[in-house]
Amino acid sequence: RDADANAALALVFHAQAEPELADQYFHKALATRPGDPRLLNNYGSFLFAQKRYDLASEYFQQAAADTLYPERSRVFENLGVTSMRLGQRDTARQQLEKALHLNQRQPRALLEMAELSFEDRHYVPARDYYERFSLLSGQNARSLLLGVRLATVHEERDKAARFGQQLERLYPGTPEYQQYL
């Protein structure tokens, strides 16, 4: 009956790769508190991890409707990333911009905006988003590849080489490294 206990069990089962049980406990939690933005966001994140993007988006939108939810910026970040997966670039951009308007210190949203801007050939904003991301987060294969590409576009050969070496050293077997080659 306790929504928090059911939500906690849902997260435990999700972490233990038991999606059916996780889904069951999320439903129990949401049956008790259907409008709880934290539960809606967590369930949306679970659905996203299950690659159920349409449904995840619905739950994120419900969570975002609560204007008093303190983690609303994260919900918009989740909505933006989900919209990217659904191929809705314009919607994704709007949601990520809203996320960053609410909280400028979100590495995931910054990296997504850097990628979007780079793909749209808006290289100066892309570099700005990327540099803000780099101040807040460690690099991963995806961000290093974007770093190489941005440095190349801005004719910063040393920086491009440095990012490329990090990509080779830290992520040699990744698709990003293959793209770099």
Regions found by a protein language model. Name each.
Residues 133-181:
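Terminal, low-structured helical/coil segments at or just beyond the last alpha-helical repeat
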Residues 1, 32-33, 66-68, 102, ...:
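Structural marker of alpha-solenoid helical repeat scaffolds
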